[in-house]
Every structure is written in C-alpha cells, then in structure tokens.
Curated annotation (Swiss-Prot):
InterPro entries: EF-Tu_GTP-bd, EF-Tu_GTPase, EFTu-like_2, EFTU_2, G_TR_CS, P-loop_NTPase, Small_GTP-bd, T_Tr_GTP-bd_dom. Keywords: Cytoplasm, Elongation factor, GTP-binding, Hydrolase, Magnesium, Metal-binding, Nucleotide-binding, Protein biosynthesis. Monomer. This is Elongation factor Tu. Its EC number is 3.6.5.3. Residues 55-59 are annotated as: G2. It comes from the Bacteria. GO terms for molecular function: GTP binding; GTPase activity; guanosine tetraphosphate binding; translation elongation factor activity. It comes from Cereibacter sphaeroides (strain ATCC 17025 / ATH 2.4.3) (Rhodobacter sphaeroides). GTP hydrolase that promotes the GTP-dependent binding of aminoacyl-tRNA to the A-site of ribosomes during protein biosynthesis. Residues 131-134 are annotated as: G4.
Length: 391
C-alpha cells in the first residue's frame, strides 16, 4: 500500500496535557492516540526524549492525532520540572490545554501551579478531564471535586463555570474496558476540545513582524535588513515601522529578496532581506523589529514569569538577590535589565520558577507572551516570558 500523504486540509491546533503528577496525563495521552491517531503505548510516551530549547534541556513527548475537523499536535511531559520549563520557554506552544485531575484526589498543588502558569504564559483555553472516576463511589463527592476544580480555575481568571469537564477513566479507555467511562469519555473529550478551543489565527493572518538579524547597505540601492518573518505578510511598497532600542520611525519596503531572487511579498517563516527607503546603514540595527506601523510598541518595564537554570543545566551555582542585573535576550539581542523581586522574596535559587519585575536600560518591541532568555556574559542562566507590560 502506498504511504498516506499528509493532507493539510484540516486546521492545525497545538495542545497538551497538564496537571498534577500521577493524575493520569500520560495514560490519557496514550488513550487519545488509541482512538484518534496512531496508537502509542504509555511507555513510548513516558520515555520522552530530551530536547534543548533556549539552552535548557526539557523532556517532552509529541504525539499527533486527528478529529473529524482538525489535526492536533499534542505535547506531554514526564516530570513537573519539564512542564514548568516547557510552558515558560514556549518550547511547545499550546493553543489550549487538557487539565487532568484525579477524581479521587481533587486538585493538588501542581494542579494549581499549572493553572497559574497557564495564565501567566498565556494558554488561552483549558478543558478538564476528570480521571479515575471509577475509584469514587459517591456521586456527591464527584460533584464536590468538580465544584472545586471550577472554583480553582475561576480564581486564576479562567471561566471556571463554562469550561467543559469530562468525567472518565483513561485506563479503562486504554484497556478497552467499561466503554461508558472509557472510550466514550475520550470521544467526548475530543469533541469538547474541538468545540471549546478555537482554531488560532494563522501566523500569516497576523500583523507583520520581522526581528532584524543583520543590516547591510547595497551601493546605489540602499539599506537591507535581513531576518526571518515571525508573522504576517510584507508587500513591496508597504509602510513599515522600525521599533525598539531607539525612537520608533517609519520607512517603506521597496524590495523583498529571498535566495537572491526578488519577490512581490514575504510571509511568515520566510528568511528575507527587506530593502528600506530612506534608512541609512546606521538607521537600523540588530535587535530592533520591522513591523506593521502601530502594531507593536517599545517598552522597558514588565512583569516576567521565569525559570532559573540549575547548576547541572549550566546555570548559576549561587542564588541571586534584589537588583540583580543580567542581560535579557529578546529575539535577536541582549539588553541589560534590573530585576525587582516580589515582596518577601530575598533571594532566588537555581532551579526556582517565580515572577518578578524587570526594568530594561533600552526599550524593546514587546508584547505579552513574548519569550526571552536571561544571560550572563553570553551564557544562558534562565528563561522567561512577559506576563504583563508595566511601562
């Protein structure tokens, strides 16, 4: 039989399982692949290979599956620390998450922590799978746990009352026993994910943005800025804005070049050189961005959610204290900034994850959800995400 061709006719959504250790995230992931994808056994998922994202080693398992209407890429992490790192670095972006809660235990500390992290790093939607319902005989107890989950979600600004909660047993689904709480619950879960988690806007449909990686001048033609287009489309003749580091200014794109060929336009994912009108060689630099005018603003103060590397991961060997001044690496450049720790936090140990405020010495084109690395002399010591812009 000929190999099946990958059809790109369904919209693509990135998703993942989150929740407390041993509540059944990996079993649920395996069960979903049994009914909607190419079956992957528990140990194939649990033995996730290590990956490096922004200099940090993370173990994540990736599976894919399809519903009637969509194609899903699903990420599952073996350990709690992997989740923290994954969510903060955005190594595996999530358009939505399936929160797995053991019905017998109810929400536990990591349940809370994953919901908080989801809020901080901008996971917009969650659907709940209440697992191991066969271990609870009392229907009133199940109702109490459901209420508790909804209240917890609401306390972190998720719409707790509206979020779908599916009850079932991932193990029964895996073993093909007790269809009602097994297979049926998995089908109900994917139906809920299909319906409740919206398809994200594709990168090309978002406003244009390209981080500037390099700048050079072509005699007689002007200045060219090169980089990989992060989102949107740029057409020859369009007005663009140069944002970050220095006061913003406007220019016009007079040419788009890729692989030494001239194009009418460049789009998300393309590595291009953009020819800019009226900009001299010193008028634009690495670390700035070219974007649709007015779509992104420069900022210096923000609240961050960050993970600090352990010594074993190549991070610091010692804690840091208030007024710590590392470099913050945004997109293509380092900017020095001062860390202001939250009240009651005296020091931060390697391996911690926490939120703190940062003030940069120069403005950077910034939006919520933007990822960055924390560096000391070119060595990565942490990773973070902008959770809120202050100024």
């Amino acid at each position: 039989m000929a190999k099946a061709k990958f059809e790109r006719n369904k919209p693509h959504v990135n998703i993942g399982t989150i929740g407390h250790v041993d509540h059944g995230k990996t079993t649920l992931t395996a069960a979903i692949t049994k009914y909607f994808g190419e079956f992957r056994a528990y140990d194939q998922i649990d033995g996730a290979p290590e990956e490096r994202a922004r200099g940090i080693t993370i173990s994540t398992a990736h599976v894919e599956y399809e519903s009637e209407s969509r194609h899903y890429a699903h990420v599952d992490c073996p350990g709690h620390a992997d989740y923290v790192k994954n969510m903060i670095t955005g190594a595996a972006q999530m358009d939505g998450a399936i929160l797995v809660v053991n019905a017998a235990d109810g929400p536990m500390p990591q349940t809370r922590e994953h919901i908080l992290l989801g809020r901080q790093v901008g996971i917009p939607y969650m659907v709940v799978y209440m697992n191991k319902v066969d271990q609870v005989d009392d229907p009133e107890l199940l109702e109490l746990v459901e209420m508790e989950i909804r209240e917890l979600l609401s306390s972190y600004d998720y719409p707790g009352d509206d979020i779908p909660i599916i009850k079932g047993s991932a193990l029964a689904a895996m073993n093909g026993t007790d269809k009602e709480i097994g297979e049926d619950s998995i089908r109900a879960l994917i139906a809920a994910v299909d319906e409740y988690i919206p398809t994200p806007a594709r990168a090309v449909d978002q406003p244009f943005l390209m981080p500037v990686e390099d700048v050079f001048s072509i005699s007689g033609r002007g200045t060219v800025a090169t980089g990989r287009i992060e989102r949107g489309v740029v057409k020859v003749g369009e007005e663009l804005e140069i944002v970050g580091i220095r006061p913003s200014k406007k220019t016009v794109c007079t040419g788009v070049e890729m692989f030494r060929k001239l194009l009418d336009q460049g789009e998300a994912g393309d590595n291009v050189g953009l020819l800019l009108r009226g900009v001299d060689r010193d008028g634009i630099e690495r670390g700035q961005v070219l974007c649709k005018p007015g779509s992104v603003k420069p900022h210096t103060k923000f609240e961050a959610e960050a993970y600090i590397l352990t010594k074993e991961e190549g991070g610091r060997h010692t804690p840091f204290f208030a007024n710590y001044r590392p470099q913050f690496y945004f997109r293509t450049t380092d900017v020095t900034g001062t860390v202001e720790l939250p009240e009651g936090t005296e020091m931060v140990m390697p391996g911690d994850n926490l939120k703190f405020n940062v003030e940069l010495i120069a403005p950077i084109a910034m939006e919520e959800k933007l990822r960055f690395a924390i560096r000391e002399g070119g060595r990565t010591v942490g990773a973070g995400v902008v959770s809120k812009i202050i100024a």
